[in-house]
Curated annotation (Swiss-Prot):
Keywords: Acetylation, GTP-binding, Hydrolase, Nucleotide-binding. This is Bis(5'-nucleosyl)-tetraphosphatase [asymmetrical]. The modification N-acetylalanine is found at A2. Residues 2-139 form the Nudix hydrolase domain. InterPro entries: Nudix_hydrolase, NUDIX_hydrolase-like_dom_sf, NUDIX_hydrolase_CS, NUDIX_hydrolase_dom, Nudix_hydrolase_domain, Tetra_PHTase. It is an enzyme of class 3 (hydrolase). Catalyzes the asymmetric hydrolysis of diadenosine 5',5'''-P1,P4-tetraphosphate (Ap4A) to yield AMP and ATP. Exhibits decapping activity towards FAD-capped RNAs and dpCoA-capped RNAs in vitro.
Length: 147
């Protein structure tokens, strides 16, 4: 059975002008261990939790951002399937916008750095093709949805 994890692709954007979606920035976290890869906040599902509850809890634990500081967008949910540490893994992601552009990020010990990045930079740091594709799909979704 595949390991299951859930997370949020967190973004922020300047809303002036509203038609300009080139100002979208994604939040990526750099892991403290392993290959120090960059991903959105995510983590394993705890017993009794649903997937979205897991994503919100992990986001709070890893970034300090509370659910009340986010708007989870309807209509975007992506499932990534890959092998991690020789085991199959499934990760579910939703898109979530921070309500405050200057929200404070407080990293847990699991991560050593964070960056707000435009799509191209985010895709360069996201080493895995599935993650790059998901970021691109998220950006495309945002550009086709009014702010």
């Amino acid at each position: 059975m595949a390991l299951r994890a859930c997370g949020l692709i967190i973004f922020r954007r300047h809303l002036i002008p509203k038609v300009d979606n080139t100002t979208i920035e994604f939040l990526l976290l750099q892991a403290s261990d392993g290959i120090h890869h960059w991903t959105p906040p995510k983590g394993h599902v705890d017993p009794g939790e649903n997937d979205l509850e897991t994503a919100l809890r992990e986001t709070q634990e890893e970034t300090g951002i509370e659910a009340s500081q986010l708007i989870v967008l309807e209509g975007f949910r992506r499932e990534l399937n890959y092998v991690a540490r020789k085991k199959p893994k499934t990760v579910i992601y939703w898109l979530a916008e921070v309500k405050d552009y200057d929200v404070e990020i407080r990293l847990s010990q699991e991560h050593q750095a964070y960056r707000w990045l435009g799509l191209d930079e985010a895709c360069q740091l996201a080493q895995f093709e599935e993650m790059k594709a998901t970021l691109q799909e998220g950006h495309q979704f945002l550009c086709s949805t009014p702010a």
